[in-house]
Design a protein with these regions (language model features):
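Short amphipathic alpha-helix that is part of the acyltransferase structural core
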Residues: 1-57
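Conserved N-terminal entry element of GNAT/NAT acetyltransferase domains
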Residues: 1-16, 171, 179-199
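Short hydrophobic/aromatic beta-strand element in the GNAT-like acyltransferase core
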Residues: 35-38, 47-51, 61, 95, ...
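Conserved beta-strand in the GNAT
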Residues: 51, 57-67, 72-82, 92-97
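Conserved acetyl-CoA-binding loop-helix of GNAT-fold acetyltransferases
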Residues: 98, 104-117
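Conserved GNAT acetyl-CoA-binding A-motif
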Residues: 112, 119-133
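Conserved catalytic-core motifs of GNAT/GCN5-like acyltransferases
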Residues: 129-131, 141, 146-161
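C-terminal "cap" of GNAT-fold acetyltransferases
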Residues: 153-186
Length: 203
């Protein structure tokens, strides 16, 4: 599905932008999931808000939380495990949603790809954390995320912490050196066979 993306700080959001974002979050996370929880939090002030639009209508959304933000510090303070520590020192992506009528067309992957791309540009080589609902583990794994916590309940819904680390690239130099060694060995064998053939002909 083709759509347009907008990335804004909280202060750059218009009142209309904010209305549609909060409406969508309430529709998906409160009404659809039948989960009464406090969606509007003070974390929004420090986030970047990524919105997917089609014909000027919000159809998808997520927010990017900076490393060491208030939310990250709060989570780390509440827990002593390594998962909270990782999330507290890295950027994270949250409140990922697609409105029901636009699901199944790859839009969630597009939004996550855009969010990851921005995190890499803004925060460099830091890992990227998410708190994923467990039924979406395979989707996030397909983007490179791996679980790093036990399952836990958050607002009555099962979640797991996941992280996207930079993949180590195999150095082309090592690949070339292996190929060179094989090629040199084959040339040596051919040279020996050639010399053996000459000796045989001379005798």
């Amino acid at each position: 599905m083709s759509c347009e993306f907008s990335l804004k700080t909280f202060d750059e959001l218009t009142s209309v932008d904010l209305y549609h974002i909060l409406k969508a979050r309430s529709q998906v996370f409160v009404v659809e999931q039948n989960c009464a929880y406090q969606d509007i939090d003070e974390v929004d002030f420090d986030c970047l808000h990524l919105v997917a639009y089609k014909n000027e209508k919000l159809i998808g959304y997520c927010r990017i939380i900076a490393p060491n933000s208030n939310k990250s510090k709060l989570k780390a303070a509440k827990s002593h495990n390594s998962a909270a520590t990782v999330e507290g020192t890295t950027p994270s992506i949250g409140r990922v949603l697609i409105l029901p009528e636009y699901r199944g067309d790859g839009l969630a992957r597009q939004i996550m790809t855009q969010a990851i791309k921005y995190c890499r540009k803004k925060y460099g080589k830091k890992p990227i954390a998410i708190s994923a609902q467990t039924y979406l583990i395979r989707f996030y794994e397909s983007l490179g995320f791996t679980p790093y916590s036990e399952f836990y309940l958050e607002d009555g819904i099962e979640h797991v912490d996941m992280v996207l680390s930079l993949r180590k690239k195999v150095k082309a130099k090592n690949q070339r050196s292996s190929s060179t060694k094989i090629l040199n060995f084959l040339l040596l064998v051919l040279a020996l066979l050639f010399i053996a053939g000459l000796i045989y002909l001379m005798v």
